[in-house]
C-alpha cells in the first residue's frame, strides 16, 4: 500500500498511484480495471486485487465504501454535467471526496480545464458510444490506416491537454499496438485487444450478468450470474405469489404474526367505545 494525500488533502492508503501506473506502462506490466456500480461489486473487485475500479461520479461514495484502498476513477457522464461550470464543479466534488482520477468523454478543452486544476484526468477515444452514429453504427474503428492516424491524433491532443491516460474503446488490436508506440498516455483497452496497458472490462460482462443488450464481441464471461439471478427471481416470484394467496385465503396474518391487547384491556376498550 502507498500513502498518499487525496485531492482533498486527506491522508489515505492506495493499492496503486498514477506514478505506479505510468511506471508499469513503461515496464510493460499489464494492469486490470473493472467497472463497479455499488459497494457490493466494489468489495468483490477489491477482494480479488484488481488494480483499478472505474465508476460513475454519482456512485463514487458507495463504491468507495466497498473498496477503501483501491485506485478509483470517477467518470463524469456527459449528460450529467453539461456546461464547463457544471463539469468543473462535478469533478471537484468527486475528487475532494477521494477519487483518484476523473474520466471525461468531452472536448480536449474540458480535459485541459480539469488538468490545469491539478486533477489526474483521462480522456476517451476510439468508438465513443455517443459517437457511434458517426461511424455508421457500433463497430471497431481503426481498421484503416487513416482511422488509426485519426485516433493517434486524438491521443496526442489529449497529451497536450494534460491527460495522463485514455480509455481506448473498440479499436483494431494491431492498430493500437502500433500507435501506442507514439503516445505517452496510459492506454485502458476496452475491446481494443492486448495493446493496452490496462485491460478493462465491465463487471456484468465478466460475471455473466449482461442483460438487455447483445454481449459485446470483446467481452468474456468467467461466471454465470444470470443463471443465479433467474433462480433468485423465481424464488422471489413464488414468495410474492404466496403472500397474495395467503392474504386472499385469510391465512395471513394469523396469531403467529399479530399481538393482542393486554388481559382485560379489550373489554375496557369495548366499554369505552360504547360510551364514545
What are these regions (language model features)?
Residues 1-276:
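Alpha/beta enzyme core
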Amino acid at each position: 500500500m502507498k500513502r498518499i494525500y487525496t485531492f482533498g488533502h486527506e491522508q489515505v492508503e492506495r493499492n496503486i498511484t498514477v506514478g505506479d501506473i505510468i511506471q508499469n506502462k513503461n515496464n510493460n506490466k499489464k494492469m486490470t480495471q473493472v467497472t463497479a456500480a455499488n459497494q457490493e461489486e466494489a468489495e468483490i473487485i477489491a477482494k480479488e486485487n484488481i488494480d483499478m475500479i472505474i465508476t460513475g461520479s454519482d456512485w463514487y461514495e458507495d463504491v468507495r465504501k466497498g473498496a477503501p484502498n483501491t485506485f478509483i476513477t470517477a467518470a463524469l457522464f456527459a449528460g450529467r454535467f453539461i456546461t464547463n461550470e457544471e463539469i468543473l464543479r462535478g469533478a471537484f466534488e468527486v475528487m475532494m471526496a477521494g477519487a483518484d482520477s476523473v474520466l471525461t468523454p468531452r472536448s480536449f478543452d474540458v480535459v485541459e480545464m480539469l488538468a490545469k486544476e491539478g486533477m489526474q484526468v483521462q480522456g476517451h477515444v476510439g468508438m465513443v458510444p455517443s459517437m457511434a452514429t458517426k461511424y455508421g453504427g457500433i463497430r471497431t474503428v481503426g481498421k484503416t490506416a487513416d482511422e488509426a492516424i485519426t485516433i493517434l491524433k486524438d491521443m496526442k491532443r489529449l497529451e497536450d491537454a494534460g491527460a495522463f491516460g485514455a480509455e481506448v474503446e473498440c479499436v483494431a488490436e494491431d492498430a493500437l499496438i502500433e500507435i501506442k508506440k507514439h503516445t505517452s498516455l496510459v492506454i485502458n483497452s476496452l475491446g481494443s485487444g492486448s495493446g493496452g496497458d490496462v485491460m478493462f472490462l465491465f463487471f456484468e460482462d465478466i460475471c455473466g450478468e449482461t442483460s438487455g443488450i447483445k454481449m459485446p464481441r470483446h467481452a468474456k464471461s468467467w461466471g454465470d450470474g444470470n443463471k443465479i439471478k433467474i433462480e433468485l427471481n423465481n424464488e422471489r416470484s413464488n414468495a410474492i405469489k404466496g403472500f397474495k394467496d395467503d392474504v386472499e385465503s385469510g391465512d395471513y396474518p394469523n396469531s403467529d404474526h399479530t399481538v393482542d391487547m393486554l388481559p382485560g384491556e379489550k373489554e375496557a376498550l369495548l366499554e369505552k367505545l360504547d360510551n364514545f
